[in-house]
Regions:
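Basic/polar, acidic-poor N-terminal "presequence/leader" segments
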Residues: 481-484
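Positively charged N-terminal leader segments that act as targeting/secretion signals
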Residues: 9-10, 14
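Immediate N-terminus of the mature polypeptide
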Residues: 2-8, 27-478, 489-648
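Hydrophobic helical h-region of N-terminal Sec-dependent signal peptides
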Residues: 17-21
Length: 648
């Protein structure tokens, strides 16, 4: 529904609103003629060219565009009322300003609970033949994927829409898993809707079934682009930083081109230059290619990635090839003068998925991987340090048992767009061998196991747990071992007036044993400690607990959405054989605001004010941080390539 801005809930507001209604009193009739209503309330409606089609549980009704909109659910009636109001208001400059000044659109599709499965809307149409597939592409600005018949574009919206080329219809069709003449598979349609939403140039997508009879149906695919031209700026000081400019959807083809210019006043070859080019879904294969080059500030990096994921539950094969070349200088933290470092890395992997149960999406996934590190120039290193700078070959194999489906919800990591939250579980066992320059006559064996589980409780919210245990064995001697445990929770949405509140809890524990000398854990920003720096504090174990409460505001200013948050973080670093009581503790409390426009490709803008009650000695504290945050992605239960559990 629509709400009135909180700050106008004063004696002045009724007067403004009354005057506004006076100018537009004939915008919407109080009593509609019974002839203009339908007895059966449809589930939803959508606009096709010059008609409005309504889809109920049984029938399809077509009304000419000249008829009064049918009687529907109250939320949609409110939308019709305020859209009519806006049309009338737009005819007069004063009333138009009053409308924009007083009224805020509120998305009534947000659900408090995280329980709706992504394939629920398609189950009753299972087995029906697909007659036609229609593509409808909405403009970036002034449209709503949940109400595509309504266009609220302002003059500024129309100007920006003209500077953007919507994704080519052929590109959308190339990303579809179904074809004309197929029978409807609820799992396949829900997978496909998620695949479209995950494209970097798509803001949101819907796949809608239009039943024609008991045996036939049309498919309507709705997509809404993001405004694909964007940029970013990384601030590292008055004389150091980086500027980027990118286009994520070149002339609607789904290709991405980006440029980067890092600079440092103390570097002789400043500024640097970088470029990357990405092609998504090459020739309908769902294979992505990324080519990149960066030169400057004493660094040179170039290479490419060619990869295909298990994009859907029915995908059988996934794999990738990655080759990277790096030339730089490094002092390894101890040398007086940085020394040259030159190496390249090769990464090849292949996975095969076997779908065991379609209803629960249970799969067995086996995979193999080969990694090679070739070092041509570097400082002197020891066998028990700087593993990544050693010459080595590694062979890995994995066996995974995966169960995964999705909830469809919003207001978790995003600010209104549809989010796909996985639920299910994953058990993966990884085994491999490593040959490096320090162990020429004897290989190291790697063994690791990982388990993760996630599910929503209707009353409490969503819970996620993951754990991992792994080590290398050199003969019978364990090396570079790790144990990790992570638990995440976020609550159902709680209404507070016209705002929505969600609470987040994160628990993370990592323990390393027999790690290399240079391998340690630190307090880092990913654990909630933005604005803190202390290179002298480290440990082999780390325990972190983070609490955050987020208030999502209904305010929508030219597509910019606001979320206010408060946080409390605690972490402790301690040695392998120490207890937490003997460790070094760090705590932070504070609040902040995040601003995001889902129509744009820019990062989330965050202002964070934090207080550190008792930081360790020699710490550098920045209580106020301003940063661009990337949109977080939920953990899923896909196996991915066979991997080493990271210690970080």
């Amino acid at each position: 529904m629509f709400i009135i801005q909180k700050k106008y809930r004063s004696s002045l507001k009724p007067g403004i609103f009354t005057v506004f209604l006076f100018f537009c009193c004939n915008a919407y009739p109080q009593n509609s003629s019974e002839r203009d209503t339908l007895r059966n309330s449809p589930v939803f409606f959508i606009h096709f060219h010059n008609s409005i089609s309504l889809y109920g549980n049984q029938e399809q009704h077509n009304l000419s565009s000249g008829l009064i909109a049918p009687k529907i659910i109250q939320e949609d009636k409110n939308l019709i009322f305020f859209d009519s109001l806006k049309v009338k208001a737009s005819k007069n400059r004063l009333t138009k300003k009053l409308y924009d000044f007083v009224i805020i659109a509120h998305d009534t599709t947000v659900k408090k609970q995280i329980t709706g499965t992504s394939d629920a809307n398609y189950i009753k149409y299972k087995g029906i033949r697909i007659r036609n597939i229609n593509i409808q592409r909405l403009n970036v600005f002034g449209t709503n994927i949940n109400n595509p018949t309504f266009n609220r574009a302002t003059r500024a919206d129309n100007i920006f829409n003209k500077t953007h080329v919507n994704t080519n219809e052929k590109i959308i069709r190339n990303n579809l898993l179904f074809h004309k003449g197929d029978t409807i598979s609820p799992l396949l349609l829900s997978d496909n809707e998620r695949i479209l939403r995950q494209l970097p140039f798509i803001d949101d997508a819907r796949i809608i079934i239009v039943p024609l009879s008991d045996t036939e149906a049309d498919i309507q695919v709705l997509t809404k682009d993001v405004y694909s031209l964007g940029g970013s700026y990384t601030y590292k000081g008055l004389k150091k930083g980086s500027v980027s400019l990118f286009e994520k959807n070149i002339i609607g083809l789904g290709h991405e081109l980006g440029f980067e210019m890092p600079y440092d006043a103390n570097a002789p070859d400043s500024p640097g230059f970088g470029v990357h080019y990405t092609i998504n879904n090459i020739i309908k294969s769902f294979v992505n290619l990324n080519v990149y080059y960066l030169n400057g500030l004493g660094n040179q990096t170039y290479g490419f990635d060619l990869s295909r994921k298990l994009v859907s539950s029915s995908t059988k094969y996934a794999g990738g090839i990655s080759i990277k070349h790096i030339k730089t200088k490094d002092n390894l933290g101890t040398l007086a003068v940085p020394e040259p470092l030159k190496f390249n890395s090769h990464d090849y992997w292949l996975s095969r998925s076997f779908l065991i149960d379609k209803e629960s999406v249970t799969r067995i996934i086996i995979g193999g991987r080969y990694l090679r590190n070739n070092v041509f120039d570097r400082p002197i290193i020891q066998p028990d340090s700087y593993f990544n700078l050693a010459n080595y070959r590694m062979y890995l194999g994995s066996f995974a048992y995966s169960v995964q489906k999705y909830y469809k919800t919003s207001l978790i990591y995003g600010y209104g767009r549809t989010e796909d939250i996985p639920y299910g579980g994953l058990l993966r066992v990884t085994y491999g061998s490593e040959y490096n320059e320090f162990n020429k006559y004897m290989k190291r064996t790697y063994m690791g196991t990982e388990y993760s589980f996630g599910k929503s409780n209707k009353t409490l919210g969503y819970f996620y747990v993951s754990s991992g245990l792994a080590t290398y064995l050199y003969g019978n001697l364990p090396m570079q071992g790790i144990f990790s445990l992570n638990m995440k929770y976020f609550s159902n949405l709680v209404s507070f007036r016209n705002n929505k509140i969600r609470n987040f809890i994160n628990f993370d524990y990592t323990r390393g044993f027999e790690r290399n000398r240079d391998e340690s854990l630190r307090f880092v920003s990913i654990n909630g400690f933005s604005g803190f720096k202390n290179d002298s504090v480290y440990g082999k174990q780390r325990l972190t607990v983070s609490l955050e409460s987020v208030l999502f505001s209904p305010a929508n200013i030219y597509g910019f959405r606001f979320a206010f948050f408060g946080f409390a973080d605690f972490s402790s670093l301690f040695a392998t054989n120490e207890t937490i009581a003997n460790g070094i503790a760090l705590a932070a409390i504070g609040l902040g605001i995040r601003i995001r426009n889902d129509n744009l490709v820019f990062n989330t803008f965050q202002i964070r004010l934090g207080f550190f009650p008792n930081p360790p000695m020699y710490s550098k504290i920045n209580n106020l941080t301003v940063s661009g945050e990337q949109l977080l992605r939920p953990n899923n239960f896909d196996s991915g390539p066979p991997s080493i559990i990271p210690y970080r």
